[in-house]
Amino acid sequence: MSCYTAILKSVGGLALFQVANGAIDLCRHFFMYFCEQKLRPNSFWFVVVRAIASMIMYLVLGIALLYISEQDDKKNTNNDGSNNDKRNESSINSNSSPK
């Protein structure tokens, strides 16, 4: 993998992370608006519900990113294995040519 490809993948990953962070912030604002209408903003239960909701959203984000990275690793491993098989076949074919 070239340096440029690694940089582009890194920037792409950061961009996706920022989008996910923005989505979490948006969900939090909607949730906080709902909670402020139903609960008092300075009550104990409001703080507890807000903390639990934040933890659940970040847990979902972490699991999603972990799943995506595992799928990418599996795809890269399979591609590397098939490339090695092709190289081995070509070297075997070149070695077994009649002289």
Swiss-Prot record:
It is found in: Virion membrane; Host cytoplasm. Glycans are attached at residue 88. Its main location: virion. The chain crosses the membrane at residues 46-66. Induction: Expressed in the late phase of the viral replicative cycle. Residues 73-99 are annotated as: Disordered. Residues 1-22 form the signal peptide. Residues 90-99 have a biased composition (Polar residues). Residues 73-89 have a biased composition (Basic and acidic residues). Residues 67-83 are virion surface. Pfam families: Pox_A9. The keyword Signal applies. GO terms for cellular component: host cell cytoplasm; membrane; viral envelope; virion membrane. InterPro entries: Poxvirus_A9. Belongs to the oerthopoxvirus OPG135 family. This is Virion membrane protein OPG135.
